[in-house]
Amino acid sequence: MKICIFGAGAIGGYMGVKLAQVGTDVSLVARGPHLEAMKKNGLRLIERESDVTVPVTASENPKDLGFQDYLIITLKAHSVPSIIEKVRPLVNEKTTIVSLSLIHI
């Protein structure tokens, strides 16, 4: 099963680590310094009782990642309209899209 998380902030990063820990083929769409850090060092999650780093596939360009079984959108709600065209390379008729977008006031 291939899962892509679009938005690798706090929520997307957390989900990415948890999915990778159980062996899911997970990729993340990110940008800037956070993207470069993930490519170089993996994705790190520090919790009360643990500190884990997992290797992940990450790209700024969704075309690099191919079709996904699930696309999880973890952007702030006001950003979602701007990514509609960008997610097209990730989805086909079998892809399930889940939006965990949050409203920030």
Provide a role label for each language-model segment:
Residues 56-89:
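Rossmann-like NAD(P)-binding element
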Residues 22, 88-91:
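Glycine-rich, phosphate-binding/catalytic loops in enzymes
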Residues 2-7, 51-52, 74-78:
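Short, functional N-terminal and low-complexity linear motifs
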Residues 103-105:
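Conserved small/polar residues in nucleotide/adenosyl-binding loops
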Residues 1-47:
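NAD(P)+-binding Rossmann beta1-loop-alpha1 motif at the extreme N-terminus of oxidoreductases
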Residues 92-96:
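A short helix->loop->beta-strand "cap" motif at the edges of active sites that frequently abuts
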Residues 43-58:
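N-terminal glycine-rich dinucleotide-binding loop that anchors FAD/FMN and/or NAD(P) in oxidoreductases
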Residues 99-100:
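Short His-Asn-centered micro-motif
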